[in-house]
Amino acid sequence: GEKYKSFGGWYISGEISRKTKGVIDAFHAMGKQCKDVSGGLPTFISPWIDGKKAVMGTDKLTKEDAVSVQEHEREWNEIFDGIHDVVDACAFQDGHIDYDELDAFFTVNKKLADKYGMKCWTNAETFDRDMPIDFLPIKFDKLRMKLEAAKRAGYDKAITFEFSHFMSPQSAYLQAGHLYNRYKDFFNLK
């Protein structure tokens, strides 16, 4: 804040997907503490959606018991209701849902954020969950689909996980540099 102009806010790094027991109280306490020690600087969270691609620790590419859009809306309505006074923005990770679900989930996320006066961003994952190899840089067409869905839903900001490995020209993955170049070309960046 006032002491260091380069410090503009807080990322509350607990990543959840559903209404985990105690999460509302925990996020509220962390958000309040961040605001209290910094004179009210903004806070944000970046949860994941418990979609069909949420298969960590397995050899599967998808799962059957994914959260529905309606369940997601119900659970996050309750979470946002309990944290909106100390959490200013939410950037849902987009990699655990399928491409044909982006619009439905993004629309619900934006609606809920607007209801509670929160900012709604996207966290565009730049690695591919559709491959049997964990993890390679995503193809630009897939990244573009995610960003366009976020734009259709009215999001005004996008962050990414994870630039240094999956999109940086300095990455060990040659594809990462190509993804970066395609991104720059698409957005006419020098």
Where are these regions (language model features)?
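Glycan-processing catalytic domains of CAZymes
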Residues: 1-190
